[in-house]
């Protein structure tokens, strides 16, 4: 499942806000606890727990933090593939069609695209096998 929220800054507090506003509520609505999260080693995700908003948020919510290896993007291949897909299928298409005067309008269009991506667009790969991310999640819950 892909979750996105647009921000004007790339900070630990915005990373924690994404989890608080979008990610944790979604998985809670599915009856699934968030036990672990995988991120890269960006400064918005990594720091000392007592001084870092994102690390503190994870600690308060009892979420284990796993970090990708330092250099190879293959470690987080699913995320890297999503970055390519959102660039090609959303941003490049959207910015050719429309000029945005504010972040809220762009977020609204992104939310619409994400609903399609998660619920209607079939995905290839060993985990999805032509299913949508939501179908993959629901099938996984049945196991």
PLM features per residue range, with description:
Residues 61-63, 85-143:
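C-terminal domain-tail junction helix/linker
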Residues 1-5, 66-68, 92-95:
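Short small-residue beta-strand/loop micro-motif enriched in glycine and branched aliphatics
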Residues 19, 50-51:
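Distinct, well-ordered alpha-helical segments
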Residues 39-41, 45, 51-58, 65-89, ...:
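RNase H-like two-metal-ion nuclease catalytic core shared by retroviral integrases
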Residues 4-31:
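Active-site beta-loop-alpha junctions of metal-dependent nucleic acid enzymes
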Residues 26-45:
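Long, low-complexity, intrinsically disordered polar/charged segments
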Residues 25, 56, 60, 115:
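Surface-exposed charge patches
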Residues 34, 64-65:
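Hydrophobic beta-strand scaffold residues
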